[in-house]
Amino acid sequence: MTEKPFPDNTPPDAGERLAKRLARQLNCSRREAELYIENGAVLIDGAVVEVLSTRVHPGQTVSVAPGARAEPVPPVTLLLHKPAGFTVGDGQPSAWNLLTPERWQQGNTPAPLKMLSKHFQNQEPLLTIPIPASGLTVLTQDGRIRRKLTEDALFMEQECIAQVQGRIVQDGLQRLCDGTAIAGKRLPRIKVSWQSEGHLRFALQGIFPHEIEAMCAGVGLELVGLKRLRIGRIALAGLAEGHWRYLQPWERF
């Protein structure tokens, strides 16, 4: 028995899919047409369109930017200065809502030729920090970055500033450096120093930011704020809170 094709319920006046129109116009495959669209190289009546599901009407003009190529958009990595209280998981307020053109901090470093909608699809957060914490957050589409930050997570140094209150126990700073015990687990030696009154600087290796609260509690301190400044060789630097930038091709964790 031959199956009936799935019915096309699209209203007749909804127009034609952009990729179909473009493929016919350029005499190329539908996939090549989609790649032109994803690269931000397709214009409808002079306006750039990157949404594959876009439909066009016969009277509209579809054009392709000069020099455009039908190539896959290379994966990118985004660096976000996450504000305290924002989450990269489920829930609100969502850090994903901060990834807007208005919050793109370009600075003085070269950036990709142009920002594309494709850059914000299938981004994966890595080495996340607790929701109450702020600071450097990494989101990537790049499998090489994903492997690096996953496989080398225990060896990657992370620098954090912990805002604390309370009275530290005698030799508490040395105990933090020597590696305290949490839930029966002995933590490795790390570098901890006073940055200023009420602020401890942690250089973590083999320890993750979410463990700092228990470490502080073990020496009589209450953690009231946490900010991650650096992961490996990538620092927060001048990235403003709530803003983001692209990881540049020459930068390495």
Report each predicted region and the residues it spans.
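Basic, flexible Lys/Arg- and Gly-enriched helix-loop patches that mediate nucleic-acid binding at interfaces
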Residues: 2-253
